[in-house]
C-alpha cells in the first residue's frame, strides 16, 4: 500500500527504483525500531519486503505475514527467502482469505478457485506450506484473515455462518 499510494497504481514497488526502495526499507526499519522500543514485536505483510531484485536490508525481528506469492509482473520474495533472512513467518495464505462481499465460501469437498495445490482448505490446510509452494519447517503460526473490503456486504451472522467450517478445521 505504501508504494502504491506513493507512486500510483497497483505496481508501486517496480516503479520506485533502488534509491526510493531503500527509503521505503528505512521507513519500515525505523518503524520496527519504534515498535520494539515499546516491547512489542513488529509485523509486516510480505508484499514489499525484499521485493524483486532490490537488496535493501530489513530488520529480521520483523515478523512477516506471508499472504501472496505475487501476480502478473509483481515479483514478491519467496517465503523460503524471507525465512533464510531470519524473519519469523506467519502463514496467511491469500487463497484462503474471506473477503466480505466477494461471495467467499468454504465448503467441504470443494477447493478454492485459485487453489494451486488442489486440496480442500477445510480438510487439508498445511500450515507449513506457503502460497508460493515453500515449505517452512517451523513457521510462527497461521492466521485466517477476514477482509472488510465491502464492510456492509454481510452481517456478522452471515460472516459467522460462512466461515464456520474453516474455524473448525
Please tell me what each predicted stretch does.
Residues 1-63, 68-74, 79-86:
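Active-site neighborhood of glycoside hydrolase catalytic domains
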Amino acid at each position: 500500500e505504501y508504494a502504491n499510494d506513493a507512486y500510483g497504481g497497483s505496481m508501486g514497488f517496480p516503479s520506485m527504483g533502488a534509491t526510493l526502495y531503500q527509503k521505503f526499507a528505512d521507513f519500515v526499519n525505523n518503524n520496527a525500531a519504534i515498535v520494539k522500543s515499546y516491547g512489542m514485536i513488529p509485523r509486516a505483510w510480505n508484499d514489499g519486503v525484499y521485493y524483486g531484485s532490490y537488496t535493501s536490508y530489513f530488520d529480521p525481528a520483523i515478523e512477516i505475514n506471508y499472504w501472496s506469492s505475487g501476480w502478473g509482473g509483481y515479483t514478491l520474495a519467496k517465503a523460503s527467502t524471507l525465512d533464510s533472512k531470519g524473519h519469523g513467518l506467519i502463514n496467511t495464505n491469500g487463497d484462503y482469505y474471506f473477503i466480505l462481499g466477494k461471495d467467499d465460501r468454504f465448503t467441504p469437498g470443494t477447493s478454492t478457485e485459485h487453489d494451486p495445490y488442489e486440496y480442500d482448505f477445510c480438510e487439508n490446510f498445511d500450515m507449513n506450506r506457503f502460497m508460493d509452494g515453500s515449505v517452512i519447517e517451523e513457521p510462527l503460526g497461521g492466521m485466517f484473515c477476514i477482509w472488510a473490503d465491502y464492510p456492509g456486504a454481510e452481517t456478522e451472522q452471515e460472516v459467522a455462518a460462512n466461515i464456520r467450517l474453516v474455524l473448525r478445521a
